[in-house]
């Protein structure tokens, strides 16, 4: 299981400060929509210059098929090692993205976004008129058939997804509160033990790391517990 540290801070200087504190550790860094819109593709290079970190560019691309393919081709060429697209864009869109990226010499990992971990059952049903777990498994099957590398889901869907697709189909699970920290705006959260027992391939941890007094210490503690 790999740790992905979410850099959802107020400015690039703060993000880079945390990245420097994590230098030498076996972690991925997650750059979200706010940071990318604010700091641009040069920020990816700045992070890689700190320690050649692997970068998950979390933009959750969602549009018509050709626009998604165009966008993913662009962001695949700026140094991102993993990107994500919304499964709810549909089979045609996901096929279009993978067909386009297959032409690149070195494409990033591509994950589907299933149900955001800010959803609970009631709020998800209001939008999709369906149950979370059934929908996520359905999204995962279609994503797997389209050739994506994995899916973003909650810890609680990870095993069901692997059973429905393949043990090699990656699950990246946000909403991780390693040692019982506050849920904040997340609904479907889990601790490290639950993530490990559900065979998450990547866990995403943000605020418990970057809001701590010693980000490196808490990161080392997490790595110790998952390796």
Curated annotation (Swiss-Prot):
Belongs to the OMP decarboxylase family. Type 1 subfamily. NCBIfam families: PRK00230.1, pyrF. Substrate binds at residues 8, 30, 58-67, 117, 177, 186, 206-207. It is an enzyme of class 4 (lyase). Catalyzes the decarboxylation of orotidine 5'-monophosphate (OMP) to uridine 5'-monophosphate (UMP). The lineage of its organism: Bacteria, Pseudomonadati, Campylobacterota, Epsilonproteobacteria, Campylobacterales. This is Orotidine 5'-phosphate decarboxylase. The active site is at residue 60. Its EC number is 4.1.1.23. InterPro entries: Aldolase_TIM, OMPdecase, OMPdecase_AS, OMPdecase_bac, OMPdeCOase_dom, RibuloseP-bd_barrel. Homodimer. Pathway: Pyrimidine metabolism; UMP biosynthesis via de novo pathway; UMP from orotate: step 2/2. The keyword Lipid metabolism does not apply. GO terms for biological process: 'de novo' pyrimidine nucleobase biosynthetic process; 'de novo' UMP biosynthetic process. Pfam families: OMPdecase.
């Amino acid at each position: 299981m790999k740790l992905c540290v979410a850099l959802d801070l107020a400015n690039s200087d703060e993000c880079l400060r945390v990245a420097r504190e994590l230098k030498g550790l076996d972690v991925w860094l997650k750059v979200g929509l706010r940071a990318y819109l604010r700091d641009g593709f040069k920020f990816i290079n700045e992070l890689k210059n700190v320690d050649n970190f692997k970068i998950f560019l979390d933009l959750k691309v969602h549009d018509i098929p050709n626009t998604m393919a165009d966008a993913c081709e662009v962001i695949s060429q700026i140094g991102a090692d993993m990107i994500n697209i919304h499964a709810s864009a549909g089979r045609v869109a996901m096929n279009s993205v993978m067909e386009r990226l297959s032409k690149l010499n070195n494409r990033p990992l591509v994950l589907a976004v299933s149900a955001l971990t800010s959803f609970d059952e009631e709020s998800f049903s209001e939008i999709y008129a369906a149950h979370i777990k059934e929908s996520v498994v359905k999204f995962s099957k279609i994503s797997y058939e389209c050739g994506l590398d994995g899916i973003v889901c909650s810890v609680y869907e990870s095993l069901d997804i692997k059973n429905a697709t393949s043990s090699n189909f990656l699950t990246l699970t946000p909403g991780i509160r390693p040692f019982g920290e506050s849920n904040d705006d997340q609904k479907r959260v889990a601790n490290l033990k639950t993530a490990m027992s559900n065979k998450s391939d990547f866990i995403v941890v943000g605020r418990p790391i970057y809001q701590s007094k010693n980000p490196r210490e808490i990161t080392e503690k997490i790595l110790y517990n998952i390796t």
